[in-house]
Amino acid sequence: MDFDSALNRTDKDFPANALRMFFTSNHDENTWNKADYETTPGAKHAPFAVMTQTMKRSIPLIYSGQEEPFLRAIRFFDKDTITLGNYQRENFYSVLLHLRKVNPALAANASFKKVTAGNEDAVYAYVRQNGKNKVLVILNWSDKEQTIKIADKTLYGNIHNVFTNNTQNVSAKEWKMKPWGYAVYVY
């Protein structure tokens, strides 16, 4: 997957302790390349936003109003007020930000291991770990349903899905992930 090439390139180009800034949009992107809700509309936004919050050696960038369905580009050089009130993505971002804040597995210095979980052209999965704290992230970066199968037996067990707030059994059994789907599990 091209994303791995980009990560590998940053591993080579930057010092080992350098932090990357990941984002789905920002003020400049919104101004020049359309509003966040246009470039990654609806469900398409979520797996990429999950990545920005859970990737190795990273700092996520969330810009003003990203939790709001702001449907137009922001003026760049003039004051442009963002009217808030709907907060369509508020719960989604609250879960991610809370997890990042309280779980040491998402610290900048926590380990990162890519995991095979299905069609690698569409599914990107990885484990972040720091001591006994471990987080499994599975992302469907496609508009098609994907079959998920975890081959790494060390990841099997009853684990907590932070978005459903339920315990799920992860095993060799296959399951389906909806288009643009995502799952984040805490061990």
What is the meaning of each model-derived region?
Residues Y126-G131, Y187:
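Active-site beta-strand termini and strand-to-loop segments that position acidic
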Residues M1-R75, S111, G118-E120, N130, ...:
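Conserved alpha/beta catalytic core and glycan-binding cleft of carbohydrate-active enzymes
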Residues K144-N165:
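Beta-strand-rich binding/interaction modules
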Residues I138:
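Short hydrophobic beta-strand that contains or immediately precedes a catalytic carboxylate
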Residues V170-Y187:
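C-terminal beta-strand-rich structural cap/linker in extracellular carbohydrate-active enzymes
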Residues N8, R72-F76, D80-A117:
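Aromatic- and carboxylate-lined catalytic core of secreted/periplasmic carbohydrate-active enzymes
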Residues W32-T40, K79-Y87, A172-K173:
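Active-site rim elements
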Residues D121-V123, N133, P179-V184:
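Short hydrophobic/aromatic beta-strand or adjacent loop that forms the aromatic wall/cage
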